[in-house]
Amino acid sequence: MVQAKSKGFQAGVKDYRLTYYTPDYTPKDTDLLACFRVTPQPGVPPEEAGAAVAAESSTGTWTTVWTDNLTDLDRYKGRCYDIEPVPNEDNQFFCFVAYPLDLFEEGSVTNILTSIVGNVFGFKALRGLRLEDIRFPVALIKTFQGPPHGITVERDKLNKYGRPLLGCTIKPKLGLSAKNYGRAVYECLRGGLDFTKDDENINSQPFMRWRDRFLFVQEAIVKSQAETNEVKGHYLNVTAPTCEQMMQRAEFAAEIKTPIIMHDYLTGGFTANTTLAKFCRDKGLLLHIHRAMHAVIDRQKNHGIHFRVLAKCLRLSGGDHLHSGTVVGKLEGERGITMGFVDLMREDYVEEDRARGIFFTQDYASLPGVMPVASGGIHVWHMPALVEIFGDDSCLQFGGGTLGHPWGNAPGATANRVALEACIQARNEGRSLAREGNDVIREACRWSPELAAACELWKEIKFEFEAMDTL
């Protein structure tokens, strides 16, 4: 009897699409799904480009290797299961890729991003590659702690309901001594704000070391709380050169009983952020997250990572607040797209909605929500639009719009608080802030000289530029 010869190892190079393009595949509930905007080089078919993305972000490499025979590639490979042309774009495609759950370490955003947005983004066969959206399976989400506390617990801690929270970034962002910094914090909190904030640039520079800042700020918080009978807070930035120093600062903040700390999650990194989020839950600290560096990653349409993905990743990694743009201020943000990722930050379940850039239905499986923070070039005339756009579960941050008041910091804070309370009352009475917002502010000016002065100062300040991030 003659035995058939085994095919054995077949060395060589073959097209990615022969293995990784599987249009008949139906994604499983346990698959992690990703949507990439792919711009192939001229002459590269979209099927080959999509398959290359699936291969290079999972099990593939440029040539067949002998060790492929030592595992079950069909079990572990990524699969490009659908390709759609991008509307109104030439030679650009949405490629949908499914990744098996076993490719990712439990509870690690770092590992997920290392795989999905790793070396493939430098692939020569592609002119551009952007990760537009991602669907985390419930089985993977349940391995994450998520936000230290979430929106509901934060409101209970603050005893503040039925309105957005009000904040302010202390300016100038660099150069103040710790004592003068604490003075500005006190004036803003006494004037009516709920929070003040370290700028993302503030860490521990020669003009103001972190420990001095923490102590003067905490003194300001305690004094303003005693005078106003309201819970107050300041986002103390614990971002540091090393994780050990970051945790040292966080532990000191917990010792002095400050209510909330802050982290720059993209420059600090997801490993550091997840570590900090777990610490904050254990210690009862709220965690404010700044997105410094995000525009380097997400602003270009054809290459990078969309902010909705970065926001989803932050919700898994952990944070109670996250900056999300303003729509109406000085920073980039188109309304529909912004509200799409705001919903992804704070809702339990979000349906697919292509009009808002949401490519997948996302179930967060009871993971706490993240409060969006609107900050950047906003002032009292923007208040009606901000309340109408973001609703109650948000934090509105006025930096220059508080500290730039002609009468000083405390009157600037009072002007913003009066404008907010007037908008909430008008909304609750059934008035439309979209149509009557300016009238609501003008009426409030009659009984608030602080607001009247702010309105006069900023009556002609607008930031009207076309958003780059559009569908």
Swiss-Prot record:
The basic functional RuBisCO is composed of a large chain homodimer in a 'head-to-tail' conformation. In form I RuBisCO this homodimer is arranged in a barrel-like tetramer with the small subunits forming a tetrameric 'cap' on each end of the 'barrel'. The modification N6-carboxylysine is found at residue 197. The gene is cbbL. It comes from Microcystis aeruginosa (strain NIES-843 / IAM M-2473). It holds the Pfam family RuBisCO_large_N. PANTHER family: RIBULOSE BISPHOSPHATE CARBOXYLASE, RIBULOSE BISPHOSPHATE CARBOXYLASE LARGE CHAIN. Its main location: other. GO terms for molecular function: magnesium ion binding; monooxygenase activity; ribulose-bisphosphate carboxylase activity. This is Ribulose bisphosphate carboxylase large chain. GO terms for biological process: photorespiration; reductive pentose-phosphate cycle. Its EC number is 4.1.1.39.
